[in-house]
Amino acid sequence: MLHGTEVLKKGFAKMTKGGVIMDVVNAEQAAIAEDSGAVAVMALEKVPADIRASGGVARMADPNKVQEIMDAVSIPVMAKVRIGHFVEAQVLEALGVDMIDESEVLTPADERFHIDKKKFTVPFVCGARNLGEALRRIDEGAAMIRTKGEPGTGNIVEAVRHMRIMMSEIREIQNKEEEELWEVSRKIEAPLELVRETAKLGKLPVVNFAAGGVATPADAALMMQLGADGVFVGSGIFKSDNPEGYARAIVEATAHYDDPEVIAEVSRGLGTAMRGLEISEIPEEGRMQDRGW
């Protein structure tokens, strides 16, 4: 896959627009994702639900694991690195992954700085809860943004919150005067140039996916109707009773997000979705969405 300039990196991200990107931990799961119509897979050692359950320090996947998944599919392969861990990113770039996720799902490596993504030829995706976080990551070189949600919970409420906040903040700046945009830039700690561009476009200058808590076809369609350009599914597929069925159904629901009849049809007889977590049950220090700044 050709990467390099900012235009090429953003162009690759746009190629996934309207699709579903699935977390996978082995070649078998990667094949299920590809057969279901996923536009890409995310290679990692454990899905977020298992990372949450096992505790400890979560790191980049073993290069052998990433290579195994890359060899198993023809669709693009992404992989996660810890926030601020630019050497993990260098390793993944050397392996030839198609995109890197600087992810709050893994244990942050740097409490002050995110990775300078402009130094890499491979594109990056980063999570955000609001417009300020999104524009700061884009300023660092992110080619794609996704909601953080609360990973590994099967609970869509935080992803909905983050998407609504971001879309509301974008609408608020669209009709502001230049001096007001200066004020917004200072308030959200984001570059004025990106604030201006977002106000003019009426959307982020890069694709904006939903992630964190998507567990059903209806969840995926909900996020698309709220303005997402596509959907990441972490634990929702392979923690369900019927991974193949849920994978296909979520792809269909994402593609036909504005057609309730299609969503109803693909949702029939899927079996039990992953067991979800109530957000209030998660202690503050255990909330992955709060990682990063």
UniProtKB/Swiss-Prot annotation:
InterPro entries: Aldolase_TIM, PdxS/SNZ, PdxS/SNZ_N, RibuloseP-bd_barrel. In the presence of PdxT, forms a dodecamer of heterodimers. It comes from Methanothermobacter thermautotrophicus (strain ATCC 29096 / DSM 1053 / JCM 10044 / NBRC 100330 / Delta H). It comes from the Archaea. Belongs to the PdxS/SNZ family. It catalyses: aldehydo-D-ribose 5-phosphate + D-glyceraldehyde 3-phosphate + L-glutamine = pyridoxal 5'-phosphate + L-glutamate + phosphate + 3 H2O + H(+). GO terms for biological process: amino acid metabolic process; pyridoxal phosphate biosynthetic process; pyridoxine biosynthetic process. It is an enzyme of class 4 (lyase). Catalyzes the formation of pyridoxal 5'-phosphate from ribose 5-phosphate (RBP), glyceraldehyde 3-phosphate (G3P) and ammonia. The ammonia is provided by the PdxT subunit. Can also use ribulose 5-phosphate and dihydroxyacetone phosphate as substrates, resulting from enzyme-catalyzed isomerization of RBP and G3P, respectively. Keywords: Lyase, Pyridoxal phosphate, Schiff base. D-ribose 5-phosphate binds at residues 23, 152, 213, 234-235. Its EC number is 4.3.3.6. The active site is at 80 (schiff-base intermediate with d-ribose 5-phosphate). The gene is pdxS. The keyword Lyase applies. D-glyceraldehyde 3-phosphate binds at residue 164. GO terms for molecular function: pyridoxal 5'-phosphate synthase (glutamine hydrolysing) activity. Pathway: Cofactor biosynthesis; pyridoxal 5'-phosphate biosynthesis. This is Pyridoxal 5'-phosphate synthase subunit PdxS.
